[in-house]
Structure formats: structure tokens, C-alpha cells
Amino acid sequence: WKWGLYATAIYESDNERFTASLGLRADANNYSSKMKNMLDQLSPRLSLSYRIAGDIYLNANAGRYYELPPYTVMGFKDNDGNYVNKGNALQYIRSDQAGLGLEYRPSSFLKFTAEGFYKHYNRYPMSVIDSIPLASKGTDYGVMGNEAVTSTATGRAYGM
């Protein structure tokens, strides 16, 4: 089983020039004791938008996100039928993210956006066999994650 809660609050200025959204999400499941407590997977999020001029907006966002490891990782068993990674203290993958960008809204149904982003990953599944994070392995049209892992890899991603 898995469960989660989400709440959000939105503020919009009277002149519709500024909008802020604050959210909080919590997730959990019964896979292991490391994943059962929703407080261990609290994900705060903040999004801001400010109309600079006319149809041009400056947008910014930041947040923490938790994601379940791949089901192939969670379901990997040894020859005796034991869930290997349950015993390896497998955890949710954590990602801290931030973004900043410009948006042009020429009409109510069309918008153009350019945004830069940065993501920092923590607790990513790392292969016990070869010490390579699963994100760096690729799939080559095969199955990824059918092996013993620990939640110890870190990483980052950034771009436009």
C-alpha cells in the first residue's frame, strides 16, 4: 500500500500582477520501516509569478520532491524469495529543485516559456555490485534495477 496527502494555498494580488503558490506533500508506503513515516517524506514547494510588463512574466519555483525507487528495485528477490533491497534500507529518492524563467502569454490558450533549472538528487539507488548509480546505467532495452542496491548515490541535473 502507498498513501499521501497534499495541501496547497494560492495567493493572487488584486491587480493579478503577482501570484504565489505554497504547497506541502507527504508520501509513505508499507514497503519498509524507512518508508512508513510520512514526516520522513515531507515535500514543501513554492512557486512565484510576477507580471513584468504586458504579457511577460517572471516565474520562480523551488521545492523538495520524493519519488519511489523503480518497482524492479523494490521487488528484487534473492533465490530464497526474500526482498533484498528491503533489507538494504531502501528509501524514497529525494530531489531538491529550483527554477527561474520568463514566460510570454500572447493569449489565454497560448504561452511560451524559457526556464533554467537545477536539481540535486540524494538517496538515489546505487548498485551494490559495481557501485554505479542506477541513473547512470541506462537500460539498453533491458530491465533496470533487478539487483541489490543501497540508497546512497547523489547527483545533479541542470539546464534550460
Language-model features: where?
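Outer-membrane beta-barrel signature, preferentially recognizing the C-terminal barrel domain
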Residues: 65-121, 131-132, 137-160
